[in-house]
């Protein structure tokens, strides 16, 4: 890597790959393709990306994880809303109205439901819902949702790879992918 632009392009590609905890193949495949430009690469039985360089010097290990926190579908209710559980370290306090992608039989965009301020009770003001109270609205009735989504499907938080001031960047998956 000779410059910021090259590092940024690699990081943007890694951060753009699918890889919610437990379903990291998209991100692992992207990492393997990029690593293969520099060394022989193989995948372990558990899906880890491994590469090594031959040499006579000291041995070092570079180790990182590649998953992204997200959610996992647990059920589809009678109105077509998806019930979910944490998949990784999802923080309930920041989920209200978040845009998400459900990785079912095809990718489906949705939004995490929230109670509008004019419908919330004064005692609920400023409080996050419990995980068993949140749902994802994918704009489908139950029958249509059941054709595309199943319990166990992963849900990723949408967010773009964002250039910030100077040479800084941000992405929902940057905490894990930057180490790769």
Predicted features along the sequence, with ranges:
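N-terminal hydrophobic/helix-forming segments and targeting peptides
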Residues: 1-180
